[in-house]
Amino acid sequence: MEYLIGIQGPDYVLVASDRVAASNIVQMKDDHDKMFKMSEKILLLCVGEAGDTVQFAEYIQKNVQLYKMRNGYELSPTAAANFTRRNLADYLRSRTPYHVNLLLAGYDEHEGPALYYMDYLAALAKAPFAAHGYGAFLTLSILDRYYTPTISREKAVELLRKCLEELQKRFILNLPTFSVRIIDRNGIHDLDNISFPKQGS
């Protein structure tokens, strides 16, 4: 039902998510933000069960911020991804597992940009591009065909738009609006939302 996508460039990570909050087959709102700011240069994108997403993402968010307050410096994207994975794995083995799928995007002065893919079974992988949701089946082949490690920001936005247009054409569900953000050495920046007219209007 939901869709997340991330594209890593040479000095940035571009991410996008749909804005639909749904309950079963009913759309509850169309301006829901599925991105959570972990720190100045780390963003967590989270989809899954409605209650689990917010509860788990905010739990990780507060712990990452607590780490900075205690130690005086922020976690790197790699450290934040491994911390998130460990918590998700621990909850998976408890009576209250979280059913969430995640993308973690960030920038580190030493490691550069990083994009991590994590599923509800706590499998973690560093990837040059990633997507979650049914839409991933339709768009991963496009990313595989057109992605290059040196892709410019303009070309990455074009590639993102190409993926979202494919969703509008082939995905049976209506995902009309997408939040877009970019993470680089200067932090997290909002880009213009990408919107599509509703089918048949």
Swiss-Prot record:
Keyword Cell cycle annotated: no
Main localization of the protein described in the UniProt heading: cytoplasm
Pfam families in alphabetical order: Proteasome (PF00227)
Subcellular location per the Swiss-Prot or TrEMBL entry: Cytoplasm; Nucleus
Keyword terms: Acetylation, Cytoplasm, Nucleus, Proteasome
SUPFAM superfamilies per the UniProt record, alphabetical: N-terminal nucleophile aminohydrolases (Ntn hydrolases) (SSF56235)
InterPro entries, alphabetized: Ntn_hydrolases_N, Proteasome_beta2, Proteasome_bsu_CS, Proteasome_sua/b, Proteasome_suB-type
Residue list for modification N-acetylmethionine: M1
GO biological process, one term: proteasome-mediated ubiquitin-dependent protein catabolic process
Biological role stated in the UniProt entry: Non-catalytic component of the 20S core proteasome complex involved in the proteolytic degradation of most intracellular proteins. This complex plays numerous essential roles within the cell by associating with different regulatory particles. Associated with two 19S regulatory particles, forms the 26S proteasome and thus participates in the ATP-dependent degradation of ubiquitinated proteins.
UniProt record similarity statement: Belongs to the peptidase T1B family.
Name under which the protein is recorded: Proteasome subunit beta type-2
